[in-house]
């Protein structure tokens, strides 16, 4: 699929990446503060198979892994597969996550809090040292440019921070501005996570609208999908989804049901075939 970029101006691109990196550091600090607040490390995270400690360990391992990928010191565990690997990115990602946790045994939440802050700082240092870096290939075989990678890692931090808070019945907020920083990364790799079974024989174009200047076209053509910025896109889409950015993030990561967000007016459908809107969330596989 075509990988999105936020801007074609290198100076603007650098500024945007720095902005997302700063948001990542802030989110990591919030996560660390939560981990130091007396959470039960053995508490089950709602909706996941992980405990709070395992979720925190995943955040550390994931940041460290992507730092190693950026600095070319990463040694793949063999989960990405080769050309004959028919698994989608979500299935390969689940295998990579299992390998991560198996190789990283730390489960003390206070220790993990410090490690999350250190890992986020190390990632941002590696990111800043390579402003012109081209795409890298992650453990699940997905190609990402640095802007996409830092955006995706911010999403991981925000969503798993929510998971940790929910394990203890705590509150956790996600700002609209942060959701808008994550969405470009989500859209850039959405085609890699296409559920081929769900998309079989489907030919549809979606336009996703999050506000002025934040519109994307997602075109599904059977077993493949392409995401592009909607600005300058020719032709009318089949279905238009106007979404609150935070609601889209929560539904996209499987942390909220789409119907609850629809009833709250956070997701609205339009276009020539609006009945296709509820199907959109079923097209993206999750690890």
Language-model segments: residues:
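C-terminal interaction segments
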Residues: 233-287
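A glycine-rich beta-turn/hairpin centered on an aromatic-Pro dipeptide
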Residues: 182-222
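Short, helix-capping/interhelical loops that line the mouth of catalytic, cofactor-
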Residues: 2-19, 64-133
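An N-terminal domain-cap segment
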Residues: 9-57, 66
């Amino acid at each position: 699929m075509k990988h999105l970029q936020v801007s074609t101006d290198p100076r603007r691109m650098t500024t945007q990446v720095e902005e997302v990196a700063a948001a990542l550091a802030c989110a990591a600090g919030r996560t660390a503060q939560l981990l130091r607040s007396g959470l039960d490390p053995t508490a089950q995270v709602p909706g996941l198979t992980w405990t709070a400690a395992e979720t925190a360990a995943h955040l550390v391992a994931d940041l460290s892994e992507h730092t190693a990928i950026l600095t070319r010191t990463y040694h793949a565990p063999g989960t990405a597969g080769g050309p004959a690997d028919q698994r989608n990115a979500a299935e390969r990602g689940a295998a990579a996550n299992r390998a991560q946790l198996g190789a990283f045994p730390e489960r003390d939440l206070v220790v993990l809090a410090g490690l999350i802050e250190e890992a986020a700082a190390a990632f941002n240092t590696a990111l800043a040292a390579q402003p012109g870096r081209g795409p890298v290939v992650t453990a699940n075989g997905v190609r990402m440019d640095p802007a996409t990678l830092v955006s995706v890692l911010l999403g991981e931090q925000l969503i798993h921070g929510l998971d940790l808070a929910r394990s203890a019945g705590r509150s956790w907020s996600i700002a609209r501005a942060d959701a808008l920083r994550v969405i470009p990364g989500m859209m850039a790799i959405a085609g890699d996570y296409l559920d081929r079974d769900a998309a079989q024989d489907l030919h549809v174009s979606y336009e996703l609208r999050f506000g002025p200047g934040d519109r994307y076209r997602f075109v599904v053509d059977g077993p493949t999908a392409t995401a592009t910025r909607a600005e300058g896109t020719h032709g009318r889409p089949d279905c238009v989804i106007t979404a609150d950015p935070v609601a889209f993030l929560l539904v996209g990561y499987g942390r909220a049901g789409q119907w609850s967000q629809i009833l709250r007016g956070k997701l609205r459908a339009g276009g020539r075939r609006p009945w296709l809107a509820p199907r959109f969330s079923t097209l993206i596989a999750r690890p």
